[in-house]
Amino acid sequence: MRTILNKLNINGEIMLIKDIMKKPIVVYEDNDLIDVIRLFRKNKISGAPVLNKDGKLVGIISESDIVKTIVTHNEDLNLILPSPLDLIELPLKTALKIEEFMEDLKNALKTKVRDVMTRKVIVAKPDMTINDAAKLMVKNNIKRLPVVDDEGNLIGIVTRGDLIEALI
């Protein structure tokens, strides 16, 4: 009995990654995070493979990586309820904290992708079955698999959503 993801393609063969992979939207390791955020929003994606200047796959970046960076940069932002005696100083202290927060946020958004990306990239080959790809994603708790050829060149990407679409 085959698993549910061993769906057959139109030729009656088990579906492979190459049957469902999409053209990847990529970022480069020297991009600023603000540029990556804009790219993610524009393309409605939550992660992307990272290439170096030679076009080689060197990492992967996700919204989680970006959020961790922003949170790390802003750990000192502590706004607590003031005592009645502090009310006189509160507007000034709050303004300074907000100013510090905005400065930290600007600095965080200038961070380079190479400084926050995940370097250990789990990849798929085009001839991998979609069932094996699903197992790999579940085992490693990842949402996307870059697809590489035998030379390690990025040729596509498969997401959990792509696997689900393949079932329909």
Swiss-Prot record:
SMART domains in UniProt: CBS
Protein name (record): Uncharacterized protein MJ1426
Origin superkingdom: Archaea
Organism the protein comes from: Methanocaldococcus jannaschii (strain ATCC 43067 / DSM 2661 / JAL-1 / JCM 10045 / NBRC 100440)
Residue runs in coiled coils: none
Swiss-Prot/TrEMBL keywords: CBS domain, Repeat
InterPro entries the UniProt entry points to: CBS_dom, CBS_dom_sf, Diverse_CBS-Domain
PROSITE patterns given in the database record: CBS
Residues covered by the CBS domain: 20-77, 117-168
Any Pfam family the entry gives: CBS
